[in-house]
Amino acid sequence: MLDAYKELRVDGGGAYIRLSSLENLKAVDAIVFDCDGVLIDARRSYDAAIRKSIQHIFTSLTGCRMPLSIIPIDVIYNLRLSGGFNFDWDSTYVITLMLFTSLPKDFQKAFSEVAQRLEGKTATQRLVSASSTLRGKLPKDYFQREGSKIKQKLKQLTKTKIADKDAAVGLLLQLAEREGYLQHLRDFIRFLNYPSEAKQSIISTVFDEFFYGAELFKQIYGFKGELGVKHGLIEKEERIVSLETLKALTEMLGEGRLGLATGRGSLAAKKTLGEALNYFNSKAMVFLEDLKYKMGGRDDLIRPYVKPEPYSLLEAVASIGGTNAVLYVGNSSEDFILVNKANKVKNIFLFAGCYALQNHSGKMLNLFAEAKAEMILPTVNALPKVLKVIKGEQG
């Protein structure tokens, strides 16, 4: 697959330029970046928030300590490989449902009986109320004893590509019907109330409190979190992109030619990127989480705008203006799907995939090569060197 590419040795590994795309890459006059995994290393924030949220939900519900190791990182990445899990809330939701299907039927039945009495309460109230009744329904060491079986089931369920959240829910409902716990799973789905507004959704409330911490959570939602999480996992993030990289790209392309298209909110981006944001065209930064809050926090209303739909990329480019060839830098399946969709609207987009700072980096490198990415980079910091080589190439 890599035979179709010219390889360059750069810091962090090999960079690859698709030979058939050289002329198009020479014409690049603007760059739009994804954020997580490209500009920001979010492995210790978003991935950890998924696992800690699920751990909190099941430890609270059952009264049994659930080790984080029950949720392998591979399960999260298996979901993302499909290109349909851009929202980490979706991944959290689907893995939570999968875990519920792994619990004994006696516990599921007890849960259904409790769930009937929980209508109308907020997310936190429902979780606290259910846990006060369900504690003691499982042996204290249940997750320690059954952990390896549950882990195996999660891996098995995510082994084949699941298109998106809705496909996953459909698959789990079919499984529940076959195995005789369909009503219990439906009750659990209703209990989680996802997607819905923040105060009513256990998934988004718990996830965001772990991710943002108390101060940012209150700024975003306008009310205090109830889990007592003082420091959010966002504080463990690190900036990948260097100021030198952004300066070099600005010198190459000119002022105002860098844009941002991300699912995260502006507050979260500013917290981690800091002064690096000064290099971006302020009108060409699209934060989908901000748009979601303008829509009343409704996850279902924002879906037509999120990756792999091309809205954020097209909006960013429209604000840059006067573009003939735009490089979009991403790190996932949905990123190159997004570029393909954007090209059906306006055929000016090229894709660069970053692979090194990921679990299974070799797999991602091959995935980008299979997708015929115009450029494959270890990290975004290789981009200035690669572009200089491209723009200096003859013929």
Language-model features: locations:
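Substrate-recognition "cap/lid" segment bordering the active-site pocket of phosphatases
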Residues: 218, 222-250, 257-327, 333-344
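Long, low-complexity, polar/charged, intrinsically disordered or flexibly structured peripheral segments
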Residues: 161-241, 248, 254-257, 262-265, ...
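Short acidic-hydrophobic, aromatic-tinged amphipathic segments that line or gate anion-handling sites
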Residues: 286, 374-383
